[in-house]
Amino acid sequence: MTGAVPTIQRLTKRSEFLACARAPSTAKGAIVVQARPRDDDAALVRVGFTATKRIGGAVERNRAKRRMREAARALLPNFSAPGIDYVIIARGGVLTRPWPRLLDDVKTALLRLAADRAAPHIG
């Protein structure tokens, strides 16, 4: 994306996560990314992370969220759009996925969602 790097904040409220759950999403490898455009004019990006009990116990879920947070920290400044809320959801294999492949999963999902937003919708 071009322009200034957007400010990145965290999603913290359940209602924000539920709003993103109704938004378009894409799955790639070990993650799912949901993206919801906000109605406000704030030029910031908000992101939240989810790892369910299917991933494992609390230790595994926290490790999965740490890996997703680092991937988001590395990629969102370059591959996100201002005014969008993202939720990154861990899938099976997120803990064992090699780091370069996990980064590629997140990057590809972000690019797919950006392409879907840019494509004209017919019908």
Positions of PLM-derived features:
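Positively charged, solvent-exposed patches that mediate nucleic-acid binding
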Residues: M1-G123
